C-alpha cells in the first residue's frame, strides 16, 4: 500500500542536485524547498494514519510536531526526520497510541528515510528538556505539522518559558557541553577530516548560539554569522550528495568532490593540481566559517555570563524606582597587568586609555597575558586589537621577547593562538605563515592541518634536553622558533 512519504528520500536527492556545471547553488532555497516538501508529505501521512487506525482520532489533544533540523528548516538531501507525537493524558489509550504511531513510523522507515521518533505527553516533553541538555537544544525549535497544532504550539511555548527560567542555572552546563565537544572533536579549522556538526565551530555550536539567544541572556549575532552558518549548511548538503547518506564527516574520499560542488575547483588547472588546490580551498573555507561560528558562540556566551554577573532588572524603567547605590552605577574595576592590558571579570581586556591603533605590540602583550594567566581574551578586546599596526618588518626587542614568551606558554598557547589567528595576527607577523595556514596535511597519519600541527609541536617543547639537562635561554628560544616555523617552506 502506498503512502504519502513513498519516494520522499529520492525526491530529496532529486531536488538537491547541482547545476549543469556541477556546482551546488542556492542552498538556502533548496533547504527551504526540502523542508516544505517534508512538512506537506507528513501532513498527508498524518491524515492517512488517522484514517487507517481502528478508532477515531480526536481533533484535539494529540498532534504531530517537528523537532531538530526539520523544525529549523535545515533539512539536508539525506537528513533524518526528527518527529514527535505529543498528546494530552487520556486523549487515547496506550494501545491506540501504539497503533497510531505504527501507522506513522513504518511508512517512513519503509521509504528508506532515517527517523528519530518519540511519543510523549506535554509533561514528558517538559521533563525531558529539563533534565537532558541535548534534548533541550533540539526541542527549543518544536513546530506543529498536523493534528492539534495548538497543542504543539503551546508545548513549544512552555518548553521555551522553562528554558528561560532555568537558563541562568543551566548556562554552565551548556558551556561545559561545548568544552567537552571541543576536547573530543577538536576545532573544525584544524582537523583534516572534521565532523562539521560536532567539531568546534560546527553546526552544533550554531544551535548553542540560538539556545543562548532564546534564553534572553544575550542577543544572537547576525550578518557574517548567518552567512557562515548557511555556507556550512551548503558543505553539509554537498557531503550528503557525495556520500549518498546522512553523515557530517568530511572524509578524505569526499573532499575533492565536495570542493568541486562548492565551486572551488579551478577549471584552468591540470587535474591533479586542480584537485589539490580545491581541497586546500575547502579547508580554508571551513576554517573561515568555523572560526566565525566559534567566535560568535564565544562572544554570545561572554555576554550571557556578563548578564549573570550583573543581574539587574531587564528594563531601565524599573531602575528609576529601584536605584542602586544612591542611583549611581558602580564603575568597573580593572586589574592592570601590563601596559594597556588588564584583567576584568575573569577575562583579559584592554586597560582604560589603551590605544590599539598607536601600539603595535599591544596584541602580543594581550596574548601573553591570556596565556600566562590562563584567561580568555574578551571578544570585544579581540575586535579592537584589529586596529594594531602590526607588520613583519618592525620587530623590536619587546616584540621578540613577547613572541618568545607566548611560544613558551605551553598548552595555553593553543586557544590564544586560535584567538589571534582569528584576527590574522600570525600572518601579519610572519607572512610565510599564510602559505601553510589551514592547509591539510598530505599524510593520513596527521589529524591536524599543517599550521595546527606546528602550534601543537611548540606546546610540547620544554626546557629539558633529551639527555636530561636543561636548555639555556638562547637555545630554548631557538627550539621554540624552530617548532613554530619547521614546516614553512
Model regions and ranges:
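Extended, Lys/Arg-enriched charged tracts that mediate electrostatic binding to polyanionic substrates
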Residues: 39-64, 94, 294-343
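Acidic/His-rich, divalent-metal-binding segments that scaffold phosphate/diphosphate chemistry
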Residues: 2-22, 26-33, 37-54, 381-489
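A cross-family structural signal marking well-folded subdomains
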Residues: 240, 307-427, 439
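Conserved catalytic core of two-metal-ion nucleotidyltransferases
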Residues: 36-43, 49, 56, 95-150
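Active-site nucleotide-donor binding segment shared across nucleotidyl transfer reactions
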Residues: 25, 29-30, 39-94, 98
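Secondary-structure capping and boundary motifs in well-ordered enzyme cores
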Residues: 62, 66-67, 73-77, 198-205, ...
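Divalent metal-dependent catalytic cores for phosphoryl transfer on phosphate-bearing substrates
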Residues: 74-81, 85-99, 244, 260, ...
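Conserved nucleotidyltransferase catalytic core and NTase-mimicking acidic/glycine-rich helix/loop elements
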Residues: 2, 16, 163-308, 474-475
Amino acid at each position: 500500500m502506498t503512502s504519502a512519504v513513498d519516494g520522499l528520500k529520492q525526491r530529496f536527492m532529486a531536488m538537491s542536485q547541482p547545476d549543469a556545471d556541477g556546482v551546488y547553488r542556492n542552498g538556502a532555497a533548496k533547504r527551504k524547498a526540502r523542508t516544505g516538501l517534508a512538512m506537506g508529505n507528513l501532513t498527508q501521512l498524518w491524515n492517512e494514519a488517522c484514517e487507517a487506525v481502528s478508532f477515531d482520532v480526536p481533533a484535539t489533544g494529540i498532534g504531530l510536531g517537528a523537532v531538530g533540523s526539520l523544525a529549523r528548516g535545515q533539512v539536508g538531501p539525506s537528513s533524518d526526520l526528527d518527529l514527535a507525537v505529543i498528546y494530552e493524558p487520556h486523549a487515547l489509550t496506550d494501545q491506540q497510541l501504539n497503533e497510531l504511531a505504527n501507522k506513522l513510523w513504518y511508512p517512513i522507515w519503509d521509504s528508506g528515510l532515517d527517523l528519530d521518533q518519540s511519543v510523549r505527553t506535554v509533561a514528558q516533553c517538559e521533563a525531558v528538556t529539563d533534565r537532558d541538555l541535548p534534548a533541550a537544544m533540539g526541542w527549543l525549535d518544536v513546530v506543529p505539522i498536523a493534528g492539534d497544532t495548538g497543542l504543539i504550539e503551546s508545548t513549544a511555548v512552555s518548553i521555551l518559558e522553562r528554558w528561560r527560567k532555568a537558563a541562568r542555572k543551566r548556562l554552565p552546563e551548556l558551556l561545559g557541553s561545548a568544552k567537552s565537544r571541543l576536547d573530543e572533536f577538536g576545532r573544525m579549522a584544524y582537523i583534516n577530516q572534521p565532523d562539521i556538526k560536532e567539531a568546534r565551530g560546527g553546526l552544533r555550536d550554531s544551535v548553542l548560539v540560538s539556545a543562548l539567544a532564546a534564553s534572553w541572556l544575550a542577543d544572537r549575532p547576525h550578518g557574517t554569522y548567518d552567512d557562515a552558518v548557511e555556507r556550512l549548511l551548503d558543505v553539509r548538503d554537498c557531503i550528503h550528495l557525495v556520500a549518498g547518506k546522512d553523515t557530517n564527516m568530511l572524509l578524505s574520499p569526499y573532499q575533492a568532490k565536495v570542493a568541486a560542488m562548492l565551486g572551488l575547483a579551478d577549471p584552468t588547472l591540470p587535474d591533479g593540481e586542480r584537485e589539490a588546490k580545491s581541497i586546500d580551498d575547502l579547508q580554508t573555507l571551513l576554517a573561515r566559517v568555523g572560526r566565525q561560528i566559534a567566535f560568535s558562540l564565544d562572544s554570545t556566551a561572554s555576554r550571557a555570563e556578563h548578564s549573570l554577573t550583573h543581574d539587574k532588572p531587564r528594563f531601565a524603567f524599573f531602575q528609576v524606582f529601584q536605584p542602586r547605590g544612591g542611583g549611581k552605577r558602580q564603575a568597573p574595576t580593572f586589574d592592570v597587568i601590563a601596559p594597556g592590558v588588564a584583567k576584568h571579570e575573569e577575562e583579559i581586556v584592554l586597560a582604560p586609555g589603551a590605544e590599539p591603533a598607536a601600539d603595535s605590540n599591544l596584541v602580543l602583550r594581550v596574548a601573553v597575558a591570556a596565556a600566562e594567566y590562563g584567561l580568555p581574551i574578551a571578544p570585544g578586546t579581540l575586535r579592537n586589537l584589529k586596529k594594531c599596526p602590526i607588520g613583519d618588518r618592525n620587530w623590536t626587542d619587546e616584540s621578540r621577547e613577547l613572541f618568545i614568551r607566548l611560544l613558551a606558554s605551553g598548552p595555553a598557547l593553543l586557544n590564544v593562538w586560535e584567538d589571534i589567528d582569528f584576527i590574522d595576527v600570525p600572518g601579519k607577523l610572519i607572512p610565510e605563515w599564510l602559505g601553510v595556514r589551514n592547509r591539510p596535511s598530505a599524510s593520513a597519519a596527521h589529524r591536524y592541518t599543517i599550521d595546527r600541527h606546528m602550534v601543537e609541536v611548540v606546546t610540547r617543547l620544554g626546557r629539558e634536553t633529551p639527555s636530561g639537562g636543561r636548555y639555556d635561554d638562547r637555545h630554548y628560544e631557538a627550539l621554540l622558533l624552530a617548532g613554530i616555523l619547521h614546516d614553512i617552506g
